[in-house]
């Protein structure tokens, strides 16, 4: 035992007094007085921010959404089964944020950006707020670069540009996710980072998406954010914002990103569930009054940034499900008014074996040809016109018995053009192949081919062009223009085949 000399005692006490600091750590604490259905009501939690993260006694995290006179209504990010009445709650002083970074590429994460694919932890140095302010007018640039989907019907008639928001809308089982996945597959080698957000889907459907992307070598540049149907409404509500935050990291580092929200109907339903449980007043279709703001603040984050901010972009493809093709319901009309156009998929067209089942008549891109390569502009104008005239004639020909030869010829060409737009799933086409296909259809080269054989002929034609006339593809890739030389090569190839 160490002996302390009497004269040392005073110096030790003096030393301890000098080191003593009178810091008081204030912790904002409340008490749960009601819990259930993923909602907790807390008493005594003063000085709490809207959207602040709360930590419960058992480690469960919640978000303060309702700040009322006598209590705080919070939604739980979990089952909340171990949160009990009378347990204490601590305000963290933080707003919901997630880690972001390159390490997320090729991974499957949940709505809180935690990995769920069994490939280990993700190390990330930076964090971003889940909800951040959208870029302003000055920081944006108008959409002018094409975002190729690989689908002829979309790239030719409903072109999408980098930084655009294009809604994919239609009934269930009409191929909405297929269009989104084809767009991801088509970004291979283009340096575009893709984020696929699955909201309220079956885990088996998400596993299928992961497998498809993995087999095609597209998972390396994709992040999948998953909030399955059996997860709490809070996580289904948060998932799209998490996806947007992950994409924003890449956008602000000068990269191009593509975000798919599949689908926003489920997010709105999850938000409705939360709002009703928080006893917020219901509005149309029992949705809360701010359901428009729910989607507008998410989709406004998609932008094409100006050169000072690195020229990055975020393109958003939100998906909305309709009932019996009713586009005038609440959520569809809201999202249509927020986005820069919509691709409308019809169950009738799908059942008529025309896939992708796009209703070209009411689908539109409000950016238009500004987001189209010159080569596509050169051939697509004629295609749109021919198809519009064909649709009108087809409706008329059902009533007329005897048609003149010119009308019959136009109907025959229209049927072949419709065949030309059909495309198998997971087989996006390069720009050169699309241009060659449309050129052949619009210039009458398919008129001699039987309607049933059009698709097989076009596959053969594209293979022949790529193997025997590679110069055509080179010209299109280098100049993005259908030059006279390229047109001559096309004519040669078609005359050799026919």
UniProtKB/Swiss-Prot annotation:
It is found in: Plastid, Chloroplast thylakoid membrane. Keywords: ATP synthesis, ATP-binding, CF(1), Chloroplast, Hydrogen ion transport, Ion transport, Membrane, Nucleotide-binding, Plastid, Thylakoid, Translocase, Transport. One of its GO terms (molecular function) is ADP binding. It is a peripheral membrane protein. The record marks 363 as: Required for activity. Transmembrane segments: none annotated. Its main location: plastid. GO terms for cellular component: chloroplast thylakoid membrane; proton-transporting ATP synthase complex. It catalyses: ATP + H2O + 4 H(+)(in) = ADP + phosphate + 5 H(+)(out). CDD domains: ATP-synt_F1_alpha_C, ATP-synt_F1_alpha_N, F1-ATPase_alpha_CD. Pfam families: ATP-synt_ab (PF00006), ATP-synt_ab_C (PF00306), ATP-synt_ab_N (PF02874). ATP binds at residues 170-177. The keyword Oxidoreductase does not apply. Its EC number is 7.1.2.2. Gene3D superfamilies: 2.40.30.20, ATP synthase alpha/beta chain, C-terminal domain, P-loop containing nucleotide triphosphate hydrolases. InterPro entries: ATP_synth_asu-like_sf (IPR023366), ATP_synth_asu_C (IPR000793), ATP_synth_asu_C_sf (IPR038376), ATP_synth_F1_a_nt-bd_dom (IPR033732), ATP_synth_F1_asu (IPR005294), ATPase_a/bsu_AS (IPR020003), ATPase_F1/V1/A1_a/bsu_N (IPR004100), ATPase_F1/V1/A1_a/bsu_N_sf (IPR036121). Produces ATP from ADP in the presence of a proton gradient across the membrane. The alpha chain is a regulatory subunit. Belongs to the ATPase alpha/beta chains family. F-type ATPases have 2 components, CF(1) - the catalytic core - and CF(0) - the membrane proton channel. CF(1) has five subunits: alpha(3), beta(3), gamma(1), delta(1), epsilon(1). CF(0) has four main subunits: a, b, b' and c. NCBIfam families: atpA, PRK13343.1. This is ATP synthase subunit alpha, chloroplastic. It comes from Oltmannsiellopsis viridis. The lineage of its organism: Eukaryota, Viridiplantae, Chlorophyta, Ulvophyceae, Oltmannsiellopsidales.
């Amino acid at each position: 035992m160490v002996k302390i000399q009497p004269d040392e005692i005073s110096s030790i006490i003096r030393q301890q007094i000098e080191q003593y600091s009178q810091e008081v750590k204030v912790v904002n604490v409340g008490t749960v007085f009601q819990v259930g259905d993923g909602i907790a009501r807390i008493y005594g939690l003063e000085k709490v921010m809207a959207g602040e993260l709360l930590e419960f006694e058992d480690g469960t995290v919640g978000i303060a959404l309702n700040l009322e006179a006598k209590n705080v209504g919070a939604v739980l990010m979990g089952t909340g089964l171990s949160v009990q009445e009378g347990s204490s709650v601590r305000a963290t002083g933080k707003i919901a944020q997630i880690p972001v970074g390159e390490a997320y590429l090729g991974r499957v994460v949940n709505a809180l950006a935690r990995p769920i694919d069994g490939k280990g932890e993700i190390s990330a140095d930076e964090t971003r707020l889940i909800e951040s302010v959208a870029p302003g007018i000055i920081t944006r640039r108008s959409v002018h670069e094409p975002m190729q989907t690989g689908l002829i019907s979309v790239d030719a008639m409903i072109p999408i540009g980098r930084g655009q928001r294009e809604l994919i809308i239609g009934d269930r089982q009409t191929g909405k996710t297929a269009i989104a996945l084809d767009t991801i597959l088509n970004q291979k080698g283009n340096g575009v980072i893709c984020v696929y957000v699955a909201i309220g889907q079956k885990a088996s459907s998400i596993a299928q998406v992961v497998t498809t992307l993995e087999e095609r070598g597209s998972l390396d540049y994709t992040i999948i954010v998953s909030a399955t149907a059996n997860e709490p409404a809070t996580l289904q509500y948060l998932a799209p914002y998490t996806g947007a935050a992950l994409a924003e990291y890449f956008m602000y580092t000068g990269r191009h990103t593509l975000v798919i929200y599949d689908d926003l109907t489920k997010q709105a339903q999850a938000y409705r569930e939360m709002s009703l449980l928080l006893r917020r007043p219901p509005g149309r279709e029992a949705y809360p009054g701010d359901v428009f703001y729910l989607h507008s603040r998410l989709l406004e984050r998609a932008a094409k940034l100006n050169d000072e901010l690195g020229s990055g972009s975020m393109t958003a493809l939100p998906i909305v499900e309709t009932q019996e093709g009713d586009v005038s319901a609440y959520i569809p009309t809201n999202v249509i008014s927020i986005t820069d156009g919509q691709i409308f998929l019809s169950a009738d067209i799908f059942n008529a074996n025309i896939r992708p089942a796009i209703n070209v008549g009411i689908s539109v891109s409000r950016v238009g040809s500004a987001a189209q390569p010159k080569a596509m502009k050169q051939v697509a104008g004629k295609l749109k016109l021919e198809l519009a005239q064909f649709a009108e004639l087809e409706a008329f020909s059902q009533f007329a018995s005897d048609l003149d030869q010119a009308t019959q010829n136009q109907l025959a060409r229209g049927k072949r053009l419709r065949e030309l737009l059909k495309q198998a799933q997971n087989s996006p086409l390069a720009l050169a192949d699309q241009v060659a296909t449309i050129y052949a259809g619009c210039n009458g080269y398919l008129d001699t081919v039987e309607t049933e054989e059009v698709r097989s002929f076009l596959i053969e034609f594209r293979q022949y062009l790529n193997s025997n006339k590679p110069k055509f593809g080179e010209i299109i890739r280098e100049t993005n223009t259908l030059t006279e030389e390229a047109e001559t090569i096309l004519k040669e190839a078609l005359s050799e085949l026919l």
